[in-house]
């Protein structure tokens, strides 16, 4: 079982507050999704991004956990970065 964080912030390039979760005047609720595979994590991330009309400057989620350990990160484009890889954060 995996968990992936789903969250957004305002984009400073669009005069939005990057410390708030309001995007285009709409509050975007943070969520944690539980799924069975990395592929499902990637799918739910892209659905969250598309359903909330997020840009790359809004995306703050994507941390992937197995149990209590973070094992990777899913970037805005849906790519999975394994812990220890170049773009893992």
Q: Model-derived features: where do they sit?
A:
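A short, exposed loop/beta-hairpin motif centered on an aromatic-Gly-Thr core
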Residues: 25-39
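A short, charged, amphipathic alpha-helix used as a generic interaction element across diverse proteins
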Residues: 36-57
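Surface-exposed beta-strand edges and their flanking turn/coil or helix-capping segments
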Residues: 17-21, 47, 85-89
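Short aromatic-glycine-(Arg/Gly/Cys) micro-motifs in beta-strand/loop hairpins
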Residues: 1-28
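A structural detector for beta-sheet-dominated domains
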Residues: 5-9, 33-36, 65, 75-77
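Residues in flexible loops and secondary-structure boundaries
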Residues: 12-14, 43, 79-84
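Short, mixed-charge low-complexity intrinsically disordered segments
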Residues: 50-89
């Amino acid at each position: 079982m995996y968990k992936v964080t789903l969250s957004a912030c305002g984009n400073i390039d669009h005069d939005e507050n990057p410390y708030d979760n309001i995007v285009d005047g709409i509050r975007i609720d943070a969520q944690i999704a539980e799924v069975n595979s990395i592929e499902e994590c990637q799918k739910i991330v892209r659905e969250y991004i598309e359903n909330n009309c997020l840009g790359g400057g809004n995306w703050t989620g994507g941390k992937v956990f197995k149990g209590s350990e973070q094992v990777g990160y899913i970037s805005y484009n849906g790519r999975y970065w394994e812990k220890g890889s170049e773009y893992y954060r």
